[in-house]
UniProtKB/Swiss-Prot annotation:
Protein name (database record): Protein SlyX homolog
InterPro entries cross-referenced by the UniProt entry: SlyX
Family: Belongs to the SlyX family.
Lineage summary: Bacteria, Pseudomonadati, Pseudomonadota, Betaproteobacteria, Burkholderiales
Record gene name: slyX
Chain segments carrying region Disordered: 48-67
Source organism of this protein record: Cupriavidus pinatubonensis (strain JMP 134 / LMG 1197)
Top-level taxon of the source organism: Bacteria
Cited HAMAP family: SlyX
Pfam families: SlyX
Polar residues composition-biased segments: 48-60
Length: 67
């Protein structure tokens, strides 16, 4: 009976450690997601605030020099 109890306590300790590690990993990933979303919003604002500039700089709309 004592051996089984010790084995269960050891397994529980490992599971608690694993759970803590996984919680830290999830928290870190959430921080990374938040940062990526913030960067995406900033990039989206840049792209949508100047749509005419992108169209004007498109080389397909330029007349070749020999015309």
């Amino acid at each position: 009976m004592d051996d089984r109890l010790n084995e269960l306590e050891i397994k529980l300790a490992f599971q608690e450690d694993l759970l803590e590690t996984l919680n830290l990993t999830v928290a870190r990933q959430q921080q990374q997601l938040d940062l990526l979303q913030e960067q995406f919003r900033a990039l989206y604002q840049q792209v949508t605030s100047a749509p005419s500039t992108a169209a004007e700089s498109n080389p397909q709309h330029e007349i070749p020099p020999h015309y």
